[in-house]
Design a protein with these regions (language model features):
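Solvent-exposed, well-ordered loop and adjacent helix/strand elements within mature globular domains
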Residues: 19, 23-48
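Core segments of alpha-helical transmembrane spans in multipass integral membrane proteins
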Residues: 23, 44-64, 71
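Short hydrophobic/aromatic segments of transmembrane alpha-helices and their interfaces
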Residues: 18, 32, 42-43, 52-54, ...
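Generic N-terminal helix/loop capping motif
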Residues: 29, 42, 58-64, 77, ...
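Extended, low-polarity transmembrane helix blocks
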Residues: 1-24, 64-128
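Short hydrophobic/aromatic-rich motifs at helix boundaries and adjacent loops
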Residues: 6-10, 30-33, 53-55
């Protein structure tokens, strides 16, 4: 049984990692002028705004629901990968995207015992 402190730390880290996706998805769904401007800057068609907003929101919901959190983390990782490629393509840095991905996975690792079993950070004692 994982410690309560570990799980709560994971929840806080997960929340902090997921938080930037909320206004990002909302602004896309509302077609905020800054999003339109950003898409133009990234040389992407405006027609992609709504589908990206829906995709981002669905990935975020999957991450927030405990039963689908691992799937959500995988989907958000893919979403961030696409965002990184888009930014790298025009010579922009991707530090924020990498940091968000680390936060998402670290939070999930701390709050999800099945993930810690799958990816142990230390060697298991195989005695006995």
């Amino acid at each position: 049984m994982p410690s309560t402190r570990l799980v709560w730390t994971g929840r806080v880290v997960s929340f902090l990692g997921a938080l930037p996706f909320v206004p990002s998805a909302a602004m896309k769904l509302l077609r905020h002028p800054e999003v339109v401007k950003g898409m133009t800057h990234l040389q992407l068609p405006e027609s992609m705004i709504l589908p990206l907003g829906i995709l981002e929101l669905l990935c975020l919901v999957a991450y927030a629901v405990p039963r689908t959190a691992v799937l959500g983390a995988i989907l958000l990782t893919g979403y961030l990968g696409g965002a990184m490629l888009t930014h790298l393509r025009i010579g922009e840095p991707v530090y924020m995207h990498v940091g968000l991905g680390v936060f998402l996975w670290l939070g999930l690792f701390l709050r999800e015992p099945r993930l810690r079993e799958l990816l142990p950070l230390r060697k298991r004692d195989h005695a006995g």
